[in-house]
């Protein structure tokens, strides 16, 4: 490394130390975040936040509140849910007359609406199972609830017990009502649930002040509050708050759950914090306590964590570009055992550019460690193509992977699934007055196979000629049932991309969808300001 590059790096370290804002270590628009120009400052309890309307004594989300659907006091009928401000039947139900019924198990409309709908009304001594009238339930997974045969492990109307319906956009996971995907809105302090495949959204709920990272354990949602520095708890079914907050370090950026342990990477606190739960979740929530910690030193800015066995790998975004290996075999005494230096990697800088690796996300695939390199210049703009660093845990070699400037700038998040490595690229964002995004270049997803070949790409963009569309920039994402749910760092959206058997990518919810619809508006947005979907997780 040249002396000028080292001096430039030291200068950047000093500038980040002077910033002093909790979000400077996120790696997302550091100057913008530090300036506080994002929308949705938390307001006092008497005022409804962004995305909510005051209806009598409550703040209601008119887009998804079944009691205030599209307007205050507009209530949906029993069995209906509210989506985009309209009452409708759930995906597994059919409108028969004026009621939403599940024709697979409804004895009055078995197999379809009775009469002209192709179904039939079962006799009083019969039950309805899989759309057929029978004398009894025959499937080994079926339980008789009244005259309906249902699977208590997955039936949203009888989840875990007869007549125990799941609400809104929830699914039934192993007899427990929950959401398939949860997204966090940093600006407004809210979380929102999404039902996989149907892409239905729940009512947004306030959890803390500025949720920065999410995790889940049993039926509890874990929310790391980026400003209050607390690990908050909420129920996964309705996001109602639970007691048991735990103090975290500054700017908690990533949560990794390995029951009974919870690992939290505190980016401005420069620590790895290890918590352990003491009890099963009850009405009082989880009892958590910190049992171990590693302090990495000032201006390291650890970003994320991934594991091979009891060995953790954590990238440092600030300071010298490094990845540390931490032995957590004894979580009460974690220890750094190796430091991998990334500064001498060939970052393929653009002509005349001085660029820094800025390692962020990390994932394990095919027994190797892959680290996303944002590859930014001193002004935090892309100084070269989106890159990855690969660490071989056996040989301890470190190599660089060029994702290609033709499709990827600012490699941001990554995850392994279905024998492939998926990488999101935040792109190059061009701002106008007031930090309004005017254009985003080379944001999307790159898919690599085991040979580290690019097998598929997807570019996120507004539809050609569309007016008023905020240029999207995708960041963190979750994978659920062969679908990527990608958080938008500019307009509060979630884009949905399906992965086919050959790893080809098909946009299902976006501005250019194939047999789909528009992107999900997960987080509300004030005119002229950014709205940040800061984290997205899939619930096991």
Q: What positions do the PLM features span?
A:
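N-terminal secretory signal peptides that target proteins for export/translocation
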Residues: 1-18
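Serine/threonine-rich, low-complexity intrinsically disordered segments
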Residues: 4, 19, 30, 137, ...
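Compositionally biased, low-complexity segments
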Residues: 7, 11, 31, 35, ...
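Bacterial N-terminal signal peptides
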Residues: 20-36
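C-terminal motif of bacterial Sec signal peptides marking the signal peptidase cleavage site
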Residues: 38-40
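Cysteine-rich modules of extracellular adhesion/ECM and protease-associated proteins
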Residues: 42-179
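Predominantly soluble domains enriched in secretory-pathway, periplasmic, or organellar proteins
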Residues: 43, 171-540
């Amino acid at each position: 490394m040249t002396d000028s590059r080292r001096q430039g790096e030291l200068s950047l370290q000093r500038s980040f130390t002077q910033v002093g804002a909790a979000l400077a270590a996120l790696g997302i628009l550091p100057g913008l975040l530090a300036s506080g120009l994002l929308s949705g400052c938390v307001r006092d309890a008497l005022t409804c936040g962004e995305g909510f309307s005051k209806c009598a004594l409550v703040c209601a989300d008119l887009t998804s509140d079944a009691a205030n659907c599209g307007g205050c006091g507009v209530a949906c009928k029993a069995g209906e849910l509210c989506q985009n401000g309209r009452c409708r039947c759930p995906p597994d139900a059919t409108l028969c007359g004026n009621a939403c019924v599940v024709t697979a198990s409804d004895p009055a409309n078995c197999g379809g609406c009775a009469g002209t709908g192709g179904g039939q009304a079962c006799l009083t001594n019969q039950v309805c199972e899989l759309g057929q009238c029978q004398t009894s339930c025959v499937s080994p997974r079926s339980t008789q609830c009244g005259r309906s045969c249902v699977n208590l492990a997955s039936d949203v109307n009888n989840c875990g017990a007869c007549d125990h319906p799941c609400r809104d956009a929830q699914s039934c996971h192993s007899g427990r009502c929950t959401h398939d995907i949860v997204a966090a809105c940093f600006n407004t302090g809210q979380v929102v649930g999404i039902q996989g495949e149907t892409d239905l959204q729940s009512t947004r709920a306030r959890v803390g002040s500025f949720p920065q990272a999410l995790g889940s354990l049993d039926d509890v949602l874990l929310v790391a509050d980026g400003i209050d520095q607390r690990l908050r708890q909420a129920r996964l079914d309705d996001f109602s708050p639970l007691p048991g907050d735990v103090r975290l370090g500054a700017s908690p950026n990533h949560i990794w759950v390995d029951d009974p342990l919870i690992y939290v990477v505190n980016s401005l606190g420069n620590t790895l914090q290890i918590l352990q739960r003491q009890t099963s979740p009850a009405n009082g929530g989880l009892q958590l306590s910190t049992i171990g910690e590693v302090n990495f030193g000032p201006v390291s800015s650890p970003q994320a964590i991934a594991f091979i066995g009891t060995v953790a790998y954590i990238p440092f975004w600030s300071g010298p570009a490094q990845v540390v290996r931490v032995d957590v075999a004894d979580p009460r005494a974690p220890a750094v055992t190796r430091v991998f230096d990334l500064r001498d990697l060939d970052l393929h800088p653009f002509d005349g550019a001085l660029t820094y690796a800025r390692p962020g996300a990390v994932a394990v695939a095919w027994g190797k460690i892959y680290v996303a390199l944002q590859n930014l210049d001193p002004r935090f703009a892309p100084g070269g193509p989106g890159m990855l660093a690969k660490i071989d845990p056996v040989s301890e070699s470190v190599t660089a992977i060029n994702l290609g400037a033709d499709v990827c700038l600012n490699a941001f998040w990554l995850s392994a699934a279905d024998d492939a490595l998926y990488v999101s690229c935040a792109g190059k964002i061009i701002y106008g007055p007031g930090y309004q995004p005017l254009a985003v270049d080379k944001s999307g997803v790159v898919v690599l196979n085991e040979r580290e070949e690019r097998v598929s790409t997807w570019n996120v963009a507004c539809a050609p000629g569309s007016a008023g569309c905020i240029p999207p920039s995708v960041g963190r994402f979750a994978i659920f049932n062969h679908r990527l749910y990608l958080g938008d760092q500019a307009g509060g959206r979630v884009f949905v991309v399906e992965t086919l058997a050959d790893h080809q990518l098909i946009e299902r919810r976006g501005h250019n969808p194939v047999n789909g619809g528009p992107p999900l508006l997960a987080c509300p947005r004030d005119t002229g300001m950014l709205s940040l979907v800061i984290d997205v997780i899939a619930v096991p």
